[in-house]
């Protein structure tokens, strides 16, 4: 596995046929995973039980589970403290920081369309991020 999916990246992927084509091989090879904070965030968009079940099935079929590390809280506190020194600690949500901690722990790159991850990565040297629109880079 190479990438950990963020909801912003998934929304773009699901809505853009060009991105679906560009990332098809990575999805097919199970190179893109998801973690429960991201799935929970995306499942919030389900309009009813049927759609909730469809989304849950999509995650199970396409995006392997990546476990959130037990030490995520320490990583988040450290990074948030560094971000506060430059006044950027409010740029990333709690879910974004959980996803970032999970990616950093597993050595995965966050696949996103969210400038917040670039901000977090400037303060977390063990975090890498990649915008889903940057295909082939």
PLM regions with names:
Residues 10-11, 39-42, 117:
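A generic structural signal for short hydrophobic patches within well-formed alpha-helices
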Residues 28-30, 61-62, 86, 106, ...:
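Structured helix-beta-strand junction loops
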Residues 50-72:
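Active-site-proximal, substrate-binding regions of enzyme catalytic domains
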Residues 64-111:
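Active-site neighborhoods of divalent-metal-dependent phosphate/nucleic-acid chemistry enzymes
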């Amino acid at each position: 596995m190479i990438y950990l999916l963020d909801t912003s990246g998934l929304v773009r992927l699901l809505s853009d046929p060009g991105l679906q084509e560009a990332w098809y091989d990575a999805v097919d090879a199970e190179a893109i995973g998801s973690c429960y904070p991201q799935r929970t965030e995306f499942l919030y968009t389900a309009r009813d039980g049927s759609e909730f079940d469809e989304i849950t099935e999509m995650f199970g079929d396409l995006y392997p589970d990546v476990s959130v590390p037990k030490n995520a809280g320490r990583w988040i506190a450290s990074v948030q403290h560094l971000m506060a020194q430059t006044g950027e600690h409010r740029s990333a949500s709690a879910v974004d920081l959980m996803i970032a901690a999970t990616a950093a722990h597993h050595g995965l790159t966050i696949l996103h369309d969210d400038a917040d991850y670039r901000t977090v990565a400037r303060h977390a040297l063990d975090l890498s991020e990649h915008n889903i629109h940057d295909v082939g880079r």
